[in-house]
Amino acid sequence: MTKGILGRKIGMTQVFAENGELIPVTVIEATPNVVLQKKTTETDGYNAIQLGFEDKREKLANKPEQGHVAKASTAPKRFIREIRDADVDGLEVGQEVKVEVFAAGETVDVTGISKGKGFQGAIKRHGQSRGPMSHGSRYHRRPGSMGPVAPNRVFKGKKLAGRMGGDQITIQNLEIVQVDVERNLLLIKGNVPGAKKSLVVVQGAVKASK
């Protein structure tokens, strides 16, 4: 069984461990989430809970949305996400999920949308090496070989210039350094994907070392 919560990335800071070690942490604000729906193997083919995060104005929600959240006796939500393989029996529709479901020392997987970088070349986008910049070379930052003559086409998957960033990224096995229940904050060791104020999903690690 896994557990999870939705939150917003606030930024990064540093905290000191008891042994004096300086730990870089990402601060995530996870105000109480509301369980909007429970999905079970019998009705949906899999187990999951649907969480709603951050209220939005009533007039921004259509009729189906309003009816959906009314079953949980809550306001329409800006973000709705599913947590797969959650403890369906231990939660009820309308119940709040808070940061205290996690504890310091646990490992989690954090999912977010990476920062958009716009249209970038093969060097920045794929880490390709550039060519010589002088001595008569005319190959500097180009993508390189497009393949042999015979196929008369460029193979799918060729690493070329294009839009970079804005992808869903999951970083696994990050350690929770501190849980601030009063301020609804999670301090997670290291960096997590996304810009400041972006939505992140924090779930129990699926590959945690036992």
Curated annotation (Swiss-Prot):
Q: Which SUPFAM superfamilies match?
A: Translation proteins
* One Pfam entry name: Ribosomal_L3
Is this entry keyworded ATP-binding? no
Source species of the chain: Bacillus cytotoxicus (strain DSM 22905 / CIP 110041 / 391-98 / NVH 391-98)
Q: What's this protein's name?
A: Large ribosomal subunit protein uL3
Q: Name one GO cellular component term.
A: cytosolic large ribosomal subunit
* GO biological process: one example: translation
Show the segment(s) annotated as Disordered.
Answer: 119-151
The gene behind this protein is rplC
Q: How does it assemble?
A: Part of the 50S ribosomal subunit. Forms a cluster with proteins L14 and L19.
| Stretches of the chain forming a coiled coil according to its record | none
Family indicated by similarity: Belongs to the universal ribosomal protein uL3 family.
